[in-house]
């Protein structure tokens, strides 16, 4: 192998949705991008999550110079509570919100005290030295705030890893993709682009997140009873839209699901989730509101059996049950392989 060659090893995220994990290796230095999980296929009963196979890394932990996280979705951070013990003492680098979401997961796993979490601000244009690699985070638009990609200067040239992104001219948080940084990379010359390509085969452009807010407004205006919105626990922008819509329609909002409740708490503490009308309430207090004055945001948009929506559909949630006149919004497209699980939950709601 040439002396300036860089090896890229994908431990997940290729020809599949989820389990994103990429290694870049040169000599005695390895950097890791993301550490996610995938959801099991329909023919994998009894399995809750699928993790990347990190056997290659376990044999080379002394070479790991850092784990760099693009954003806080499960398919990019969900593997950390399970795999980080085998990767220590490697530091984990993330933006502010992503670091906060990782902290919640590691605290639950009793790993936070052992972890070396390091925060960066992409707007400050940092350059992080990691062995022979120089990592430059840049902001991208996604359905969660504080998402980034990485420009990685390597002995073989500049490699750009986009992470998940969209070119959204009207993002919920008002923060655009850093086009100036992308233009700078173009001028410097990019040796390799490692790009998100989900739905790349679909014609046209991905709509702005604001389109979802318009749909929420219509559904909330028509709803006569309670409104249930199922989403991902880490989809902070979607939770913000539910809060804003509920406030406009005179409804309180109760988060359902431990992971969602924790993420809402940390996002509020860090200023990434706002509730100026004080519509957020605890699930145990939601019963005191009339049906037309309460909305729930919950986990379970992918039909996960232990998530809040599944427990509501099965009639075994301790705080709430769905009934006639209620409206349920499943605010996510089923991940490939999850369609049957999602439709099974929907059927049980009727």
Which ranges hold each PLM region?
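His/Asp/Glu-rich metal-coordinating catalytic cores
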Residues: 1-68, 73-289, 304-321, 337-344
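Gly/His-enriched, cation/cofactor- and phosphate-binding structural elements
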Residues: 253, 330-331
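Aromatic- and Gly/Pro-rich donor/ligand-binding loops
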Residues: 300-301, 332-336
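Conserved acidic residues
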Residues: 65, 191, 294, 326-329
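Conserved two-lobed SF2 helicase motor
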Residues: 293-302
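His/Asp/Glu-enriched, well-ordered alpha-helical/loop segment
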Residues: 344-350
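Anaerobic metallocofactor- and corrinoid-dependent redox/one-carbon enzyme cores
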Residues: 295, 312-313, 322-327
């Amino acid at each position: 192998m040439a002396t300036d060659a860089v090896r890229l090893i994908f431990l997940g995220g290729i020809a599949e949705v989820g389990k994103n994990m990429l290694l870049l290796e040169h000599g005695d230095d390895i950097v890791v991008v993301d550490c996610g999980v995938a959801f099991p296929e329909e023919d994998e009963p009894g399995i809750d999550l699928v993790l990347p196979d990190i056997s290659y890394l376990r044999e080379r932990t002394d070479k790991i110079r850092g784990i760099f996280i693009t954003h806080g979705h499960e398919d990019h951070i969900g593997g950390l509570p399970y795999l980080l013990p085998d990767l220590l003492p490697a530091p984990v680098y993330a933006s502010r919100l992503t670091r906060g979401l990782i902290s919640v997961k590691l605290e639950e796993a009793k790993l936070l005290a052992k972890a070396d979490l390091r925060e960066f601000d992409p707007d400050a244009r940092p350059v992080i030295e990691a062995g022979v690699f120089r990592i430059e985070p840049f902001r991208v638009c996604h359905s969660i705030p504080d998402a980034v990609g990485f420009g990685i200067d390597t002995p073989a040239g500049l490699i750009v890893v986009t992470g998940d992104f969209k070119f959204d001219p009207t993002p919920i948080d008002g923060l655009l993709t850093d086009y100036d940084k992308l233009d700078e990379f173009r001028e410097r010359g990019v040796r390799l682009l490692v790009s998100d390509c989900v739905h790349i085969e679909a014609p046209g452009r991905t709509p702005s997140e604001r389109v979802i807010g318009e749909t929420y407004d219509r559904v909330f205006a028509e709803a006569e009873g309670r409104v249930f919105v199922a989403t991902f626990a880490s989809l902070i922008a979607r939770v913000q839209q539910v809060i804003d819509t509920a406030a406009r329609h005179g409804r309180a909002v109760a988060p359902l699901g431990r992971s969602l409740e924790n993420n809402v708490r940390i996002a509020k503490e860090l200023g990434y989730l706002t509730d100026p009308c004080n519509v957020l309430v605890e699930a145990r207090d939601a019963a005191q509101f009339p049906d037309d004055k309460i909305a729930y945001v919950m986990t379970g948009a992918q039909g996960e059996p232990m998530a809040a929506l599944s427990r509501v559909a099965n009639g075994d949630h301790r705080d709430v049950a769905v009934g006639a006149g209620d409206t349920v919004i499943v605010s996510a497209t089923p991940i490939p392989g999850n369609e049957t699980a999602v439709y099974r939950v929907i059927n049980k709601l009727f």
